[in-house]
């Protein structure tokens, strides 16, 4: 059994760990700003995606508030986003849908410059603000199609 002093020490250690593991408010705000900007670009009226009423939403640890700092100083924070289209042409394959989203990202000067090599399932934007390791994150954008009419 632990005594009151030991419990307080453990609580303090856990608080410090929580503060050091969680992303900072600045990091969170930068990620939110980026996610919203990408969403605005992918859903704007001029977009090739517009006719499919895309919905852009964060996923994974970011949406549930458990995003953590990277352990390796060369790594960055991971932000997962889904670009959900409501419908598609009947002849489209998964590759066609992914290419449509990639084309829209490449049509934006900033996103084209930070677009990583094509991934297997998603597009990745690599943000490197001022070269500061604490301001590095990447956004994985996963194209999807809502075929059931149900969405989160």
Predicted stretch roles:
Residues 1-76, 87-96, 122:
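N-terminal regions immediately upstream of nucleotidyltransferase
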Residues 42-45, 64, 98-152:
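Conserved catalytic core of two-metal-ion nucleotidyltransferases
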Residues 80:
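Glycine- and aspartate-rich repeat motifs characteristic of hemolysin/RTX-like Ca2+-binding segments
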Residues 84:
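Short hydrophobic/aromatic beta-strand micro-patches
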């Amino acid at each position: 059994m632990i005594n009151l002093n030991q419990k307080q020490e453990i609580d303090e250690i856990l608080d410090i760990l929580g503060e050091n593991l969680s992303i900072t408010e600045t990091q969170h705000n930068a990620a939110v700003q980026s996610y919203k900007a990408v969403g605005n670009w992918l859903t704007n009226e001029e977009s090739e995606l517009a006719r499919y009423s895309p919905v852009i939403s964060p996923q994974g640890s970011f949406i549930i508030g458990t995003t953590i700092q990277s352990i390796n100083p060369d790594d960055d924070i991971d932000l997962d986003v889904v670009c959900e289209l409501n419908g598609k042409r009947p002849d489209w394959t998964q590759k066609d849908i992914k290419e449509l989203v990639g084309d829209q990202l490449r049509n934006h000067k900033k996103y084209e410059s930070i677009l990583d090599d094509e991934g297997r399932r998603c597009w990745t934007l690599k943000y490197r603000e001022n070269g500061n390791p604490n301001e590095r994150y990447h956004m994985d954008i996963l194209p999807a199609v809502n075929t059931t009419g149900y969405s989160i």
